[in-house]
């Protein structure tokens, strides 16, 4: 889960995206537009963060299996297969990219 600092950075990024939209359209962005962009940005960051955590657990699964504190993690304990973890990670990445596509309204950045 993102830290508080990451959440602030994410919100700031969305506000900057709103400012960039203003410069392109020569219009002041509405508060609803800024809120929408912020929510999309937070959701995309949350999904990408989740995918990163799955990747980390996947890479560390053999080490985690030998450490008392981490041996009960789903991949380390075998409760989840590497194929299942990969599918879950891929779904999170795809969902995050879809959110970003909607957020950017199909524009290239």
From Swiss-Prot:
PROSITE patterns: UBIA (PS00943). GO terms for molecular function: transferase activity, transferring alkyl or aryl (other than methyl) groups. Induction: The subglutinol cluster is highly expressed when mycelia and hyphae are transferred to fresh media for a 3 hour induction period, remaining expressed under conditions of heat shock. The cluster is repressed in cultures reaching stationary phase or in early germinating cultures, as well as under conditions of UV, salt and oxidative stress. It is found in: Membrane. The chain crosses the membrane at residues 39-59, 84-104. One of its GO terms (biological process) is terpenoid biosynthetic process. This is Polyprenyl transferase subC. It comes from Metarhizium robertsii (strain ARSEF 23 / ATCC MYA-3075) (Metarhizium anisopliae (strain ARSEF 23)).
């Amino acid at each position: 889960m993102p830290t508080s600092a990451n959440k602030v950075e994410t919100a700031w990024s969305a506000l900057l995206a709103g400012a960039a939209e203003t410069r392109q359209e020569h219009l002041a962005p509405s508060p609803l537009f800024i809120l929408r962009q912020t929510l999309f940005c937070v959701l995309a960051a949350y999904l990408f963060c989740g995918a990163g955590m799955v990747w980390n657990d996947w890479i560390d699964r053999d080490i985690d299996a030998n450490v008392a504190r981490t041996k009960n993690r789903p991949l380390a304990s075998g409760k989840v297969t590497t194929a299942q973890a990969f599918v879950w990670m891929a779904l999170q990445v795809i969902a995050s990219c879809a959110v970003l596509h909607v957020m950017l309204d199909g524009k290239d950045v």
